[in-house]
Amino acid sequence: NLVISDIMMPEMRGDELCKALKNNIETSHIPVILLTALNNDKDILSGLEIGADEYIVKPFNIGILKANISNLLTNRALLRSKYGSLDMDDEDDHEDECINCSQDIDWKFIANVRKNIEDNIDNPALTVDVLCNLMGMSRTSFYNKLRALTDQAPGDYIRLIRLKRSVKLLKEGTHSITEIAEMTGFSDAKYFR
């Protein structure tokens, strides 16, 4: 997904649209390109400060616009492919989990999701529906947001956090497999065999 908007629009200005998108938890991850005839440094900085990913001044070369679009989408795809796998060696590196967090609101969202999972990690009944309820979001909105930021479905993300905690506990060597399974919400120790 990508939004391209002129700043001078009849219903809502493009910079207002950008600000609304970037301040909404459901849309803050979507890249925004602003097109405008406003070409002074103050306007450009203002557009970038509200969260625009690109600010292109008119008149512009359509090839440059296409290249910017391609670069934004390619970079997001590269990040998804790089961080989409379950890397068990970086259990303490939470920044890698949010591949598409360009706004503070996105980092806070991921931190809140992670906190809710970690607070309930020993509960085998922690499901996507329970997590959605804890986050105060509909299942669809939650799925779309988490998938866009982490390239993980919510169920897979819960499992990822549980597995990372399990790996950490296994490395400590102070608990049995059965204890670790219980401590991380797995109903059966067979997940570790």
Where are the predicted features?
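Receiver (REC) domain active-site loop signature in two-component systems and cognate sites
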Residues: 9
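Active-site beta3 strand of CheY-like receiver
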Residues: 1-4
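Terminal helix-turn-helix DNA-binding modules in bacterial transcription factors
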Residues: 148-187
